[in-house]
């Protein structure tokens, strides 16, 4: 009996190891279609999705297949995308991909390669980097962006990982106070040039849930790290909750939200040197010391844009100097103290 029990136990373990490592939720036509999608990226700041921005995203799929990827959760997007927004698409599939093994599964690889649009759900961006980076997932996403010229988007953590540089949160979440006191704090974990390769996001880092006032200071710290560590110009894009930025082939960053009913904003955070030329890195950006990035109280120019239902307000990502419907501000930091001021018009 002991031998039989051991055999059954080993068989059970073997079958468990071979169990499907991902979960799929599917709605729509299972037959693959191959329309020509339109290039674009949709960045949402978290909380409830903005319907107008999501319609923009889905229309870029041109009637094709949409795949939602996440590490936890289930099929909350399927009916919303497939039938509630009035956009004709062939299918929506949510893939829950909670491990490297799942990310390298042949089915996951195939479905992502067949997609015309991919949406990265909210969650914990550290999981996305730990489980998806250097796997079939990021390879397929980069093929979607650069070969198929499809559309990609994400909310919250799904927005956070879209830039050439990104805050990975691999350790603990970090506050503005901790970042400004020491921009090399162990919780300020910045990834660079190793996940998504999107030409629209070169020299960009993002932040989300930005209507928490604490995030302005930490975002300046993130950008300071990028400028110092990689010796190149970097621009930040941040979104309040319920707010989205959509960038198409014209590189106009259209801002969607509920203004004037709600105070929904996106922020385009541009170091002054990007506008006026030259290279003016932070005066002090050293491990163990408070950040100083001042340059006569003009270190960083910020274009704050109200998000509207029709996305008419925008920022020009071609020049990073002009926009419609926004106001300019200065942000600067002295010895770890964040300040902001208006720019005279």
Language-model-detected regions and their locations in the chain:
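Bacterial Sec-dependent N-terminal signal peptides
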Residues: 1-21
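C-terminal and late-domain segments of enzyme folds
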Residues: 20-63, 168, 173-345
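N-terminal beta1-alpha1 cap of cysteine-dependent amidohydrolase-like domains
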Residues: 21-121
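A residue-level signal for conserved active-site and pocket-lining positions in enzyme catalytic cores
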Residues: 66, 118, 156, 206, ...
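Short, solvent-exposed loop/turn and secondary-structure capping segments
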Residues: 79-80, 130-131, 164-166
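Catalytic-core regions built around general acid/base machinery
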Residues: 111-114, 134-149
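Catalytic nucleophile loop
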Residues: 119-122, 145-166
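Glycine/threonine-rich flexible loop motifs
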Residues: 125-135
């Amino acid at each position: 009996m002991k031998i039989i029990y051991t055999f059954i136990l080993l068989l059970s373990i073997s079958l468990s190891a071979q169990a499907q490592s991902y979960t799929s939720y599917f709605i729509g036509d299972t037959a693959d279609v191959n329309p020509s999608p339109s290039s674009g990226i949709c960045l949402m700041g978290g909380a409830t999705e903005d319907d107008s921005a999501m319609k923009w995203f889905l229309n870029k799929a041109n009637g094709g297949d949409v795949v939602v990827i996440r590490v936890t959760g289930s099929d909350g997007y399927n009916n919303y995308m497939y039938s509630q927004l009035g956009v004709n698409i062939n299918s929506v599939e949510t893939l829950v991909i909670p491990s490297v093994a799942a990310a390298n599964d042949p089915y996951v690889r195939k479905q992502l390669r067949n997609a015309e649009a991919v949406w990265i759900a909210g969650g914990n961006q550290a999981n996305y980097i730990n489980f998806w980076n250097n796997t079939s997932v990021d390879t397929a996403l980069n093929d979607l962006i650069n070969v198929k010229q499809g559309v990609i988007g994400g909310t919250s953590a799904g927005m956070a990982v879209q830039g050439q540089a990104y805050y990975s949160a691999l350790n603990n979440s970090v506050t503005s106070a901790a970042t400004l006191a020491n921009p090399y704090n162990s919780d300020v974990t910045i990834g660079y040039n190793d996940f998504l390769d999107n030409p629209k996001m070169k020299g960009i880092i993002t932040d989300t849930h930005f209507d928490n006032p604490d995030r302005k200071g930490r975002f300046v710290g993130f950008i300071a790290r990028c400028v110092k560590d990689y010796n190149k110009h970097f621009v930040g894009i941040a979104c309040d909750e319920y707010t989205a930025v959509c960038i198409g082939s014209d590189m106009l960053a259209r801002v969607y939200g509920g203004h004037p009913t709600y105070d929904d904003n996106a922020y385009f955070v541009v170091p002054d040197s990007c506008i006026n030329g030259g290279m003016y890195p932070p005066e002090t950006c050293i491990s163990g010391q408070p950040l100083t990035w001042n340059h006569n109280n003009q270190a960083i120019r910020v274009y704050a844009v109200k998000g509207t239902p029709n996305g008419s307000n925008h920022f020009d990502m071609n020049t990073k100097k002009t926009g419609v419907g926004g106001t300019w501000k200065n942000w600067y930091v002295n010895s770890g103290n964040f300040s902001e001021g208006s720019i005279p018009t």
